[in-house]
Structure formats: C-alpha cells, structure tokens
Regions:
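NUDIX/MutT-family hydrolases
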Residues: 91-95, 101-133
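Conserved N-terminal beta1-alpha1 strand-loop-helix module at the mouth
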Residues: 132-165
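Active-site-adjacent beta-strand/loop module that shapes the phosphate/pyrophosphate-binding cleft
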Residues: 20, 78-100
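Conserved N-terminal beta-strand and adjoining loop/helix that marks the start
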Residues: 2-26, 46, 77
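Short polar catalytic/cofactor-binding loops
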Residues: 18-23, 32, 142-148
C-alpha cells in the first residue's frame, strides 16, 4: 500500500486590485517562463518569511510597478489547488498609492474597467477576484414583514434616504 502523499505547502500570495480615478483596474501579464505564462493577473506577489501581508504587497508593488502603496482594504481570499502547488491568494483593493505604475519587470500592463475584463484572460485564481470586484458593494434587503401595500412607501423612504446621503 503506497504511503499517503505529503501535503503540499501553501504559498501565500498578495494581489492588489488597483482602481484609478476612472474606475479601471490594473492588470499585469505573466511573463514567459513563469507558471501560467501569458495569462493576466492583478499585480502582487509572494510573502517572504516573517513578512506581513501588507508589507509584502507594498514591497511587491514597489518592485514591480515603482509605486508606494498608501492603503488597501481586504477584498477576498481565494484558496487555489493546482496539481503542482497550493496557493492562498489574498486580494486587497486600493485607490491610494503614490507614483505612476510602470512595468519594472518587463510585464505588459493594461487598465480596464471591470466589466471589460474577459475572465478567460485571467489566471483561475484571479477570476474569483474579478467576480468579487463586480459584486455590488451594498444590497437593499426588504424586511420580511412588509405587506405588499407597504412596499411602495418603504421603497420611497429608502430612495429619500439615499438622496439625503
């Protein structure tokens, strides 16, 4: 009976969902010779031993794009299972950085609106990030006890509250 396979170590990777003033996201193309070469991804990279997730993301964006990350918020964490590796992709969303992103590691870059991104051009893990990015930031949930005749009034009040804010 063969021995059970050793569990693969999990590689923790950070990704930045960088949104510009027009609502576009920055994508980088994986270079030749790397896993999933030619596919597009959100910029970022691996954590180094002892590094915090934000420190890793800040370092990677400086190395790859020449920018200084000022702040980022968690968006989604995606566990990925590839035949050759296990991956935890930790995506953070930001519109706060200093500098103009430029390719410092010979990767192609492009800015696209989230709805313009074809999921098939992304790595499988990055498709989950795109899906999370496309979700609404807020949902309106009607109370369960609202009678049909009260729904119109309830919706009008919600509309008024939105206009005031």
């Amino acid at each position: 009976m063969p021995a059970p396979a050793e569990p693969k170590p999990v590689m923790h990777v950070m990704a930045a969902v960088m949104l510009d003033a027009l609502g576009r996201v920055l994508l980088a193309q994986r270079p030749a010779g790397k896993h999933l070469a030619g596919m597009w991804e959100f910029p970022g990279g691996k954590l180094e031993p002892g590094e915090t997730p934000m420190a890793a993301l800040t370092r990677e964006l400086h190395e790859e794009l020449g920018i200084s990350l000022l702040h980022a918020e968690p968006l989604i964490r995606v566990p990925c299972h590839y035949p050759e590796r296990e991956l935890l992709l930790d995506a953070r969303q930001t519109d706060q950085w200093e500098g103009e992103p430029q390719s410092l590691e010979s990767q192609a870059l492009q800015w696209l609106l989230p709805e313009q991104v074809d999921p098939s051009m992304l790595t499988p893990a990055d498709r989950w990030i795109l899906q999370a990015l496309r979700l609404p930031t807020r949902y309106s949930i009607t109370p369960a006890d609202v009678r049909p005749e009260q729904r119109r009034l309830w919706c009008e009040r919600i509309g008024q509250a939105i206009e005031r804010s």
